[in-house]
Amino acid sequence: MTESLSNSLKVQLRSADAKVPTKGSTTAAGYDIYASQPGVIPARGQGIAKTDISFTVPVGTYGRIAPRSGLAVKHGIQTGAGVVDRDYTGEVGIVLFNHSDKDFQINKGDRVAQLILEKIVEDAEIVVVESLEETQRGAGGFGSTGKN
């Protein structure tokens, strides 16, 4: 496989309503993903935004479906179930949670999430140990490193 193909994000448009993911700026971390059909995410509920796209991420990465900050701040919309493995080739649906008290209308062509390509360690060796090396933090979790 050539270097250029292994670093490619291959996108399949599954209908005439599907759109290729785009970046909002040249240095944006994520690619905006678009809804291919209208829909409603009910108040305090959840639903799936249809995209009519499939994609294969570059070698050594996985796709993380992340929220769009504007939807989160203005409408209380968050994403869920956001891991797309390299070997998944089906349609990518976007799980959306509506944390607001108003139904959220999705229109065809709306940007509903962003795709972030993250590097992964493939085939990490799992080693069972009796104990872990002590660290300054130790077992402290959830807010243990400070107040703010």
From Swiss-Prot:
Positions binding dUMP in this chain are: 69, 82, 85, 88, 137, 142-143
EC number(s) in its UniProt entry?
3.6.1.23
Show the Pfam families listed in the entry. Answer: dUTPase (PF00692)
Obligatory cofactor(s): Mg(2+)
Q: In which pathway does it act?
A: Pyrimidine metabolism; dUMP biosynthesis; dUMP from dCTP (dUTP route): step 2/2
Question: Which InterPro entries does the record match to this protein?
Answer: dUTPase, dUTPase-like, dUTPase-like_sf, dUTPase_trimeric
Print the keywords alphabetically: Hydrolase, Magnesium, Metal-binding, Nucleotide metabolism
What reactions does this protein catalyze?
Answer: dUTP + H2O = dUMP + diphosphate + H(+)
Which GO annotations describe the biological process of this protein? dUMP biosynthetic process; dUTP catabolic process
Positions in coiled-coil regions: none
Q: Which GO terms describe its molecular function?
A: dUTP diphosphatase activity; magnesium ion binding
Could you say which protein family the record assigns here? Answer: Belongs to the dUTPase family.
Q: What does this protein do?
A: Involved in nucleotide metabolism via production of dUMP, the immediate precursor of thymidine nucleotides, and decreases the intracellular concentration of dUTP so that uracil cannot be incorporated into DNA.
Q: How does it assemble?
A: Homotrimer.
What is the recorded name of this protein?
Deoxyuridine 5'-triphosphate nucleotidohydrolase
Please name the source species: Kluyveromyces lactis (strain ATCC 8585 / CBS 2359 / DSM 70799 / NBRC 1267 / NRRL Y-1140 / WM37) (Yeast)
